[in-house]
Amino acid sequence: MMESRHAQRKNEHLSLAAKYYDQVHQHHYFDQVRLIHDSLPEMTTDDVDLHVQLADNLEIECPFYIEAMTGGSDQALKINRQLAQLAHKHHLAMATGSLSIISKDPQSFSSFEIIREENPDGIIFANLSANASLDQAINAISLLKANALELHINAAQELIMPEGDRDFNWLDNIQYLVSELEVPVIVKEVGFGMSKTTIAKLQTHDVHLINVSGRGGTNFAAIENRRNHDINFESLLDWGQTTPESLLEAHSIRRGKTEIIASGGITSPLDVIKAGVLGARAVGVAGYFLNILQNEGYEALDQTLGEWQVIVKRLLALLGCSSFTELSRVEYVLGTDLLSYARQRHLR
């Protein structure tokens, strides 16, 4: 049976993400962050606890997790099944791709449902657009028995997308969903990063979990521009803030019980640690894990996830930190470009 045009678009996204993977990873922005070594950590690896408390009712067993990738097609179902199996095995949280498609193509739900089937007791974040209705949000959470809801904000992607939305009045709806839902709400960019202005707006609208999702990983500007045969948005291919820049922005404005999550261009356990040093409470990884799964296979990703957990724990011990949250006290220096950005933005 031929898949719907919505499912075909999801397959296009997967294909183009793979096509542009090497291109978007030519620049590794976390190289602009250097950690200061202390030769006397006074710590054992047994002292390290990887658990992270993101909210009163949301704890994850490891500071990095499998970030939102895909859903809505047969190909996505296969990918989500494998990712969910690995999330279950390694006790990792996992975010779904956008569930917005199920209101237009109800048959696509099986590609999301498989995540809960393969990981019945794990931490799962459902994912919807920031303009989702309360009924859509409640339905998505209920169908997946989700532990949290990600609301993605993706104005740049939508504007480049030929069939994208053109209305970005999101803040009031976000605040309404936060107030009405029983699970924590994470507001997430999709690879364009956040400024301190954005983060301040979210905080004043009662958002306390913010994923800055910076430039450096999957590039939806490039993906949607390739799909757009009418207008060329090539000038926006490097639009937005990188993940380190976004974390510095967040650190300058974060207040109260707001917790920052990082994603975008995370390709190593050291990147996870550096994100924590810059203020992230947790770190999402999507493109890097998907690339391994698609090109090297299930067993290779299985091995990678296990190794990352071991390395993150050992790096925490090396830095004298018994938990991921203690990374905020680790000293660091910035490379020339990132330091210049921070000074011009009055971030340090």
Curated annotation (Swiss-Prot):
Q: Among the entry's GO cellular component annotations, what is one? A: cytoplasm
GO molecular function annotation:
FMN binding; isopentenyl-diphosphate delta-isomerase activity; magnesium ion binding; NADPH binding; oxidoreductase activity
Kindly list the positions annotated as binding substrate: 9-10, 157
Q: Which InterPro entries match?
A: Aldolase_TIM, FMN-dep_DH, IPdP_isomerase
Swiss-Prot/TrEMBL catalytic activity: isopentenyl diphosphate = dimethylallyl diphosphate
Subcellular location(s) of the protein: Cytoplasm
Protein residues bound to FMN: 68-70, 98, 127, 188, 213, 218, 286-287
Describe, as the record does, how this protein assembles with itself and its partners.
Homooctamer. Dimer of tetramers.
What is the protein name given in its UniProt record?
A: Isopentenyl-diphosphate delta-isomerase
Question: What is the source species?
Answer: Limosilactobacillus reuteri subsp. reuteri (strain JCM 1112)
Q: What gene does the UniProt entry assign to this protein?
A: fni
